Swiss-Prot record:
Keywords: Cytoplasm, Isopeptide bond, Nucleus, Repeat, Ubl conjugation. The lineage of its organism: Eukaryota, Viridiplantae, Streptophyta, Embryophyta, Tracheophyta. Ubiquitin exists either covalently attached to another protein, or free (unanchored). When covalently bound, it is conjugated to target proteins via an isopeptide bond either as a monomer (monoubiquitin), a polymer linked via different Lys residues of the ubiquitin (polyubiquitin chains) or a linear polymer linked via the initiator Met of the ubiquitin (linear polyubiquitin chains). This is Polyubiquitin. PROSITE patterns: UBIQUITIN_1, UBIQUITIN_2.
Length: 305
């Protein structure tokens, strides 16, 4: 076996050519391990968060799993606690070094993953992103406490939003299907939340706890939580005006104890616009099956024509 294809290992360490057996404290009847180096083997470096650099002998064809196993051999860190980063990207276990174009003497970064834990990101309205170490079983209360530890914001002033939904304190991250590296949005709750009322066509009145800064989307999500009505079937009316999703309650001057009206949008309903000769645009809620007579009747209801 040509020397350049031999790698000798003793006590978990690869032996360097210029050193002596005595340097490695190899005594009589010691056992060395011979590993064949495929042509094309190479060295890469791993940098930990503590600043320590580890050198690994690898092949381009090694998978990320293999690399993590080598790190375990050297450092004793279980693979499931290792995250490897290269060129700003987290490396996936089944892929090879070649897949990521990792070449000889490349440097990877090793980040430790807490047991069963994961990282999530929290983005504030100022654009700042906070990184948190969490567990899937953490409640929203726990997450708010972690944010308080990092940022000093009292939990009762925090509102956390994920996938357009405000997260409730007693629920867990798993309940909301929040997974590793998900991004939550943090909105500060101004002291001064308020109650508003939502009246349905059946005459039922729903009470909601809201903030002036809540968007109409948020309000519809709260109605969904209470009543199970999907937001896309809700139309909210205040002072004769249909409220638009991206706007806030403050935009419409909706104050404490205001009453909104909830109209259900039939599945398959749609909005169309009618432009008059004066340039005014009227919005109509219609169904594809509406006749032109129906449409004219709706225009009469709205405009008296």
């Amino acid at each position: 076996i040509p020397p350049d294809q031999q790698r000798l290992i003793f006590a978990g360490k690869q032996l360097e050519d210029g050193r002596t057996l005595a340097d490695y404290n190899i005594q009589k009847e010691s056992t060395l391990h011979l590993v064949l180096r495929l042509r094309g083997g190479m060295q890469i470096f791993l940098k930990t968060l503590t600043g320590k650099t580890i050198t690994l002998e690898v092949e381009s064809s090694d998978t990320i799993d293999n690399v993590k196993a080598k790190i375990q051999d050297k450092e004793g860190i279980p693979p499931d606690q290792q995250r490897l980063i290269f060129a700003g990207k987290q490396l996936e276990d089944g892929r090879t070094l070649a897949d990521y174009n990792i070449q000889k003497e490349s440097t990877l970064h090793l980040v430790l993953r807490l047991r069963g834990g994961m990282q999530i990101f929290v983005k504030t309205l100022t654009g700042k992103t906070i990184t948190l170490e969490v567990e899937s079983s953490d409640t929203i209360d726990n997450v708010k406490a972690k944010i308080q530890d990092k940022e000093g914001i009292p939990p009762d002033q925090q509102r956390l939003i994920f996938a357009g939904k405000q997260l409730e304190d007693g629920r867990t991250l798993a309940d909301y299907n929040i997974q590793k590296e998900s991004t939550l949005h943090l909105v500060l709750r101004l002291r001064g939340g308020m109650q508003i009322f939502v009246k349905t066509l059946t005459g039922k009145t729903i009470t909601l706890e809201v903030e002036s800064s809540d968007t109409i989307d948020n309000v519809k999500a709260k109605i969904q939580d209470k009543e199970g009505i999907p937001p896309d079937q809700q139309r909210l009316i205040f002072a004769g005006k249909q409220l638009e999703d991206g706007r806030t309650l403050a935009d419409y001057n909706i104050q404490k104890e205001s009453t909104l009206h909830l109209v259900l949008r039939l599945r398959g309903g749609m909005q169309i616009f009618v432009k008059t000769l004066t340039g005014k645009t009227i919005t109509l809620e219609v169904e594809s099956s509406d006749t032109i007579d129906n449409v004219k009747a709706k225009i009469q209801d709205k405009e008296g024509i």
